[in-house]
Amino acid sequence: NQTVQPDLWVIVDDGSTDETPQILADYAEQYPFIKIITRENRGHRSVGPGVIEAFYYGYDQVDVSQFDYVCKFDLDLDLPPKYFEVLIERMQQNPRIGTCSGKAYFRDKKNGELISEKCGDEMSVGMTKFYRSICFEAIGGFVRQVMWDGIDCHKCRQLGWIAVSWDEPDLRFIHLRPMGSSQQGIFTGRMRHGFGQYFMGTGLTYMTASSVFRMLHPPYFLGGAAMWWGYVKSLLQRKPRFEDKELVKFINKYQWQCLLKGKTKATDALNARQANIWKQNYA
C-alpha cells in the first residue's frame, strides 16, 4: 500500500510452519520486486542475534551498492501509505541523516487505544531500520547481539551521521507485536532489553533513570522493573560486554549529557559537534 514501491524486497522465511510460505509465494507472483529466500528452521526462536542472522542471510545475497537505501523491516507492522516516501524525502533534504524511522504504536487489548512504544527521537526503531546505504556500510552494519538496534545509532553519531525518528501522522505505524512482548512474556522481553543495555555499555545510573521512565508507561511499573533487573542481573553475573571500547566511551559520555541537559539538547549538541567528522569523510 506504499506510495513509493521498493526496487527489491528480500523476504527471509526462516522456518515458518504455518501458511506463511504459501502467502509469500502468492505475493511474489503479484509483485516482481519481491524475492523470497528460505532459511533452515533453527528449531527455536532467537531474538536479537537470530533476527540479525536472518537479516544478513538475505542481505548477503544482494549487491547493496546498487541501491541508495536499505531497510531492515519486520513483517508484523501496519504502515501508513506514505511511510517510505516521507523517509526518503527527509533524507534527500538532509544528507547527514544516516538512519531514520517513524514511531511504533500498539493497540491496547482492552479498549483498542493506540499506545506509543516511547522510542526516543535520537533512534531509528528496530522493526523498521531505514538506512542510507553508504552509512550502513560505514558503521559496519548491525552487531549480532541484543541491542543491535541501539548500538547502530550510536555508531552513526560517532561517525558524524544523524540518527532520528519522527512522531507524525504519516510516520506512525502499528506494531502488531509490541516491544518486549517476547514469546515468553512481557517480563522476559523487558529483562532481555535490560541485558542489551548492559551489553552495550550503558552505565547503572543512566539505566536506573531509563527504567524509572519506563515504569511510568504501560505496562506500568513491571516493564521498567524488569528492564532494571535484567541489567543488574547481567552486571552481577559479569556477562560479556560490547568490545568496542571507544564506542562505549562515546555512548557513556553522551548518556551523561542526556541526564544533565535532557536528551534533546544533548543530542542536538552532539550532532553539531560531530558535523565536521561527517564533512571530512562523506560530504
Regions found by a protein language model. Give the residues of each.
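Non-catalytic, C-terminal membrane-associated alpha-helical segments of glycosyltransferases
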Residues: 187-282
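Catalytic donor/gating beta->alpha subdomain of glycosyltransferases that bind UDP-sugars
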Residues: 142-210
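Short beta-strand-to-loop acidic/aromatic patch adjacent to the donor-nucleotide binding site
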Residues: 66-78
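Conserved donor NDP-sugar-binding/catalytic core segment of glycosyltransferases
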Residues: 43, 78-115
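Active-site nucleotide-sugar/metal-binding loop of Leloir-type enzymes
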Residues: 52-69
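A conserved acidic beta->alpha catalytic loop
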Residues: 13-22, 42-43, 77
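Short, acidic, metal-binding catalytic loop of nucleotide-sugar glycosyltransferases
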Residues: 1-6
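Conserved nucleotide-sugar donor-binding
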Residues: 125-140
